[in-house]
């Protein structure tokens, strides 16, 4: 967000220095409507999303921890998300990524005649690896995994669902006739986490998150 490597401005895990200038502040200063939607993990102070230039936010892990009082991860099935400063528990089989993309598309629709920024640090495909609403064994009564990594067999389902969520955003931009005038950047912050093994045209790609290896540092940029 700052254009700097972590070596130059790292304070602590999950902390973004308030003295830093980030791209959302620059765009807001130049008349853009701004939204951050997804994972926060940049500090727990109440006003931080606004401080860093976001008019609106729908976030996981801002003021609250990643688990509830019973140890359930709170980002995927029936999640707890912060919507513009208010923590909300969603029920009835809702799924965090769906709710976030709903908000993104609503934000785009109401600002389609303005300059806008959507920063979408998506929840998917981070562990815990869990069923999605498209999985055969998705449980609408589930309140989240108690196991940090979940079950790696669901990683493929989560990748497919990520693709579906990106597709929903593209489809909405197309519907609003905004695709030709919208810059979309798709990237990541690290390689796969253990124990995930992916495939490409050359064969298997082992996990590497947290390692200073190609598998840990090479990410998509589209």
Predicted regions and their residues:
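Formylglycine-dependent sulfatase
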Residues: 1-222
């Amino acid at each position: 967000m700052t254009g700097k490597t972590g070596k130059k401005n790292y304070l602590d895990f999950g902390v973004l220095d308030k003295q830093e200038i980030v791209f959302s502040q620059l765009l807001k200063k130049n008349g853009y409507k701004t939204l951050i939607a997804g994972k926060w993990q940049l500090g727990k102070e109440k006003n931080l999303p606004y401080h860093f230039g976001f008019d609106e936010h729908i976030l996981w892990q801002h003021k609250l921890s990643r688990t509830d009082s019973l140890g359930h991860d709170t980002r995927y099935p029936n999640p707890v998300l912060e919507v513009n400063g208010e923590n909300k528990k969603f029920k009835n089989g809702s799924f965090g990524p769906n709710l976030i993309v709903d908000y993104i598309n609503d934000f785009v629709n109401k600002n389609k005649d303005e300059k806008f920024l959507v920063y979408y640090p998506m929840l998917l495909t981070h562990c815990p690896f869990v069923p999605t609403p498209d999985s055969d064994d998705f449980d609408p009564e589930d309140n989240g995994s108690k196991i940090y990594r979940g079950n790696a067999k669901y990683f493929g389902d989560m990748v497919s669902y990520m693709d579906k969520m990106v597709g929903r955003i593209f489809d909405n931009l197309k519907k609003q006739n905004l695709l030709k005038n919208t810059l979309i950047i798709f990237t990541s912050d690290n390689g796969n986490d253990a124990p995930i093994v992916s495939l490409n045209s050359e064969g298997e790609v082992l996990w590497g998150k947290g390692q200073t290896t190609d598998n840990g540092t090479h990410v998509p940029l589209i």
